[in-house]
Amino acid sequence: VPGTSPDQPRNEMAMTTTRSRKALYIGLPLALVAALGAVGYAHWFSQAPGYPRPIVEQANALHEHMLSFDSHVTVPLDLGTAGNEIDKDGPGQFDLVKAGRGRLSGAALTIFGWPEIWNGPNAPHRPTPGFVDEARHQQEVRYKIITGMVRDFPNQVGIAYTPEDFRRLNGEGKFAIFISMLNAYPLGHDLSQLDLWAARGMRMFGFSYTGNNDWADSSRPLPFFNDTADALGGLSPLGEQAVKRLNDLGVIIDVSQMSTLALQDVARLSRAPVVASHSAPRALVDIPRNLSDKEMQLIKDSGGVIQVVGFGQYLKPLGKPVLDKLQALRARFDLQPLQGLANALMPGDAVIAIWPESRFGEYASSLYGILEEEPKATLKHYVDAIDYTVKKVGIDHVGISSDFNDGGGLDGWKDVGEIRNVTAELLTRGYSEADIAKLWAGNFLRVWEQVQKSAHPVALR
C-alpha cells in the first residue's frame, strides 16, 4: 500500500467545484447536461467491469471535485477537420466530449514539429533544407488548432497561462489547455523563438524528440539521420543558454526523451524544478527512452515531477512471439541478433546510416508492423510503473500522462474518456484520495507555481 505524505500547500481537492452540471458536453443545451452526466457515468461504468461497484462509485465521486491533468497529449494536424471535430465524440483519443465524459480538467496539448520521414513524396527520405520549414509549419498548424478551439468554443475551453488560470477555468466548467512544446529542431539556432512562444502561451518546453538536434542529444538518436549516441555530450552551448532563458521566462523544462547526459546537464544548470512530461521507469523496460533510477532522483532533487506515461511498449517488455518475429526480420536484413530492447522498438542500428532510403523504408515499415502485434499493456502495468516510481522518489514527485495521439493508450485507458479507470486502479492499490489528487494534478501544479515564482521576468501573454 503506497505511503502518504503531508498535504500540498494548496489542497487540490478542496479548491475545486463539482463539474457534472458544467457545460463540458459541447453543443448541448444546459438542460440536458445533468441527464447526460448520468449517461456518461453509466457509459463509463460499462467500460470498467473489472472494478467493484464501490470502487467505481468512489472514483466517479473523486472526479466530480478533484482536479485532473494529463501532461502530454499531442495535437493531431487534422484535429478540427471533418470527421475529427473537437466538439464531437470522434475516432481520436482526445476531444472535448471525451474530456467531459472522463471529467478531465485539463491537459498539456503539445505542439511539436518533426517531418514524418515515412510520409510525403519519395518517402522515407533523409533531411533536406526544407525539413526545418516543414517542422515550423507543423508548429503553426498545431498552435492555430489550439487557438481555434478557444475561439470557437469560448464557453467550454480556455488556455491556462498560470496555475490560477487552471483552477479558475475548472471552476467555470471549462477544459483548461496548457500549451507545451516538444522538440527544439524547428527552432534552428534562434534562442529568441523561446521568447516568442512563451509570449504566445507556451508554458513547458522539451528539447528532444526522436533524433538529435542542435540543442540536445536525444535518448533515441536516429542513424538514418546520421545521428550517433551522445554526439554533443549532452547539451550544446545553445542548449545551455536555453536552460537559463526558459528559467527566466517561467517556462517548465521537460526532460523526457533527452539523453542521460543532456538530462544531467539540465538538472545541473536549472534553478527551477524540471519535469519529465511523459516517461516511464527504465527498471521495468530497459531502454534509453525510459528513466533510470538515477535520472528520476535528479528530477526529484530539482523539486520536479515524473509524469508516468501510458505508452504500452515502455511499460512491459515485448513477448516472445513478437521478439521471435523481430529476430527473423533482423536476420533478413543482415542485422545482428537483438541485445536488449532498444533497437527492438525503433530502427536504431548504426549500420542503417549507410542504407539506401528504400531499404530503410522497407525495414522500418516491417518493424512497426510487427510491433503492432504485441498485446496492449493494461492499467495494471501502468499502475505498476506508478508504484515503482512512487517507491523510488515519493508520492510528491509523480504524476500522470497518456501520450495520446502519438502512441499512448492502454487496455482500460484507450482515450481521455476513460481516465476514471486509472483512478479506480489506484484506489484498488490502496492509494488515498489525497495522494490520488497529487498524482492527477496537485504535484504538477505545485511545480508549475515554483517555476513561475523563479522566473525573471515571468513570460507575459
Describe each model-derived feature in a short phrase.
Residues 72-74, 257, 278:
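Histidine-centered divalent metal-coordination motifs
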Residues 1-14:
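Short, Lys/Arg-enriched N-terminal segments with co-localized hydrophobic residues
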Residues 240-255, 261-262, 295-301, 384, ...:
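Substrate-binding cleft of carbohydrate-active enzyme catalytic domains
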